[in-house]
Design a protein with these regions (language model features):
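Bacterial Sec-dependent N-terminal signal peptides
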Residues: 1-21
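Generic, well-ordered alpha-helical scaffold segments in large soluble proteins
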Residues: 116-119, 123-126, 168-172, 191, ...
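Hydrophobic alpha-helical segments
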Residues: 357-455
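Glycine- and hydrophobic-rich flexible loops that cap the catalytic core of alpha/beta enzyme folds
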Residues: 221-222, 229-231, 241-245, 250-393
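Substrate-recognition/specificity elements adjacent to catalytic centers across diverse enzyme folds
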Residues: 22-237, 242, 255, 325
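Beta-sheet entry/capping signal
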Residues: 28, 36-38, 185, 196-199, ...
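Second-shell loop/turn segments in exported
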Residues: 50, 97-111, 333-339, 444-454
Length: 455
């Protein structure tokens, strides 16, 4: 009896710790002449609340639309145009994956996410006329993570794989398509500069509005956060920025992170497929969305499946599955938050070794004159027996990859003698001087790194 009472009390106090409301009296938001919020607080949780509040004041609509997409509610807001996104969110089973991996997330970061959620919810409570879809609220850390999960699946080209299956067009699918324009980053150490200072600069080619437009903010807490930079709608931390010790930024990269598999179905047997010497059965689901007809919301549904490989769809030629690393990771936002708080290159690099962010080039510089470039990503370790540029056989464990290359195994440059690193959405094998570039021969061709130039 006493043991049970202890467990109940422990659970009660544990829950109270992680659900305490933010004291807004500890938060100060000062806007400069450009309207950029400079946010000061005692804790990181309060800081996240302040960021959510300031961003909501400026662009509450975009934050909501991002979360609506991540929580399969966008069609409730915009009707038919939102239905494909809602279906995609359900196809990748974001809710199930996040529920299963939620306990792996650092509790300190969950507190930060909770603070951000409280800020959004309070703004919605005080501005009900600005709420787009009531069902979205209250925002929770899990709802926040579901949007991140969707966004990172799309950035891994997963949506293009899904479209190829729908359209039964795999010939035109090219994950290494070249951009006409590219974001660019560069860092210079004192080996290159003539004033003894280290520099990093970035020109990311982001839109001026929408969910992938930058929002600038300056964050200061008594728990060690001191950073200025930019973030996306709905993210509780800075995604590219500089603190008192270091700076980092991103451009887009396109190594081969995503694969499509065609299942070998058992004839005259519903949803059964061959895998090695076994017969397995697809799990069946129904995704729902809403369309408006004469102002009346009509619910529509579509079947989808799950195989041992991942999300699965049927088209006129068979059943196909999509597999990419982002489908098995939920800690990317946590990793970015920890990057915010890093104090040295070694600390920053160890955070990268979490290997939770599925892509993006990273450029870096710090006050100790370190500069660094890496083509980051969740790159599967694949069996050389197969050609990974097309549709793969989905009937053998030989194609079911489960491991990824470690951070130290990816193309990178650390403190080159040339004194500079750069990237413009192009090949990682041209990221510094000719003599110090990563050598493509050192990397498995199945990693699929870009070889083209840009800008």
């Amino acid at each position: 009896m006493s043991f049970m009472l202890f467990r109940i009390l422990f659970l009660f106090f544990s829950l109270s710790i992680f659900s305490q409301k933010v004291d807004v009296n500890n938060i100060e938001i000062i806007r400069d002449n450009f309207g950029v919020p400079h946010i000061y607080s005692a804790t990181d949780k309060e800081l996240a609340y302040g960021l959510a509040w300031a961003h909501s004041e400026d662009d509450f609509k975009t934050i909501q639309e991002a979360y609506l997409a991540g929580n399969a509610l966008l069609s409730k807001h915009i009707g038919l145009r939102g239905a494909p996104v809602d279906f995609l969110t359900q196809l990748i089973q974001s809710e199930e994956v996040i529920d299963s991996l939620y306990n792996t997330i650092d509790k300190e970061f969950i507190e930060v996410a909770e603070g951000y959620a409280q800020g959004i919810n309070r703004y919605a409570e005080l501005n009900p006329d600005k709420v787009l879809v009531k069902k979205l609220f209250p925002i929770t850390p899990k709802k926040m993570l579901k949007y991140s999960f969707l966004q990172l699946f799309i950035s891994s080209e997963g949506d293009r794989a899904v479209r190829a299956i729908f359209e039964n067009d795999f010939e035109s699918l090219n994950f290494q398509r070249r951009n006409e324009l590219g974001s660019n980053l560069f860092s210079f150490s004192t080996k290159k500069t003539n004033n003894g200072e280290t520099y990093m600069a970035v020109n990311t080619h982001q839109p001026l509005d929408g969910p992938t437009s930058w929002y600038e903010a300056h964050l200061e807490s008594k728990e060690g956060t001191s950073i200025i930079g930019a973030t996306f709608a709905g993210a509780p931390c800075i995604l590219t920025g500089s603190n008192k010790n270091l700076a980092w930024t991103h451009t887009v990269n396109r190594p081969d992170k995503t694969d499509i598999f065609q299942l070998e179905m058992v004839k005259k047997s519903k949803r059964k497929y061959y895998f090695d010497d076994k017969i397995l059965k697809l799990k069946k689901y129904r995704g729902k969305a809403f369309i408006n007809i004469l102002g009346i919301p009509i619910r529509v549904s579509k079947k989808y499946y799950s195989s041992v490989y991942g999300p699965t769809l049927k088209n006129k030629t068979g059943f196909f599955s999509v597999r990419t690393g982002s489908l098995f990771k939920v800690r990317a936002l946590e990793q970015w938050w920890k990057m915010n708080k890093a104090n040295s290159f070694d600390e920053f690099y160890s955070i990268l070794e979490m290997n939770e962010i599925p892509g993006y080039n990273i450029g870096y510089a710090d006050k100790d004159d370190n500069i660094f470039y890496i083509s980051n990503g969740l790159i599967p370790v694949r069996n050389d027996k197969f050609k990974w540029t097309g549709v793969l056989p989905g009937n053998t464990s030989e194609t079911l990859w489960t491991d990824y290359y470690k951070t130290r195994e990816l193309p990178q440059v650390i403190n080159p003698e040339s004194g500079y690193i750069y990237n413009a959405n192009h090949s990682p094998f041209k990221s510094t001087s000719i003599d110090e570039n990563p050598n493509p021969k050192d990397f498995d061709s199945n990693m699929g790194f870009e070889t083209f130039d840009n800008n």
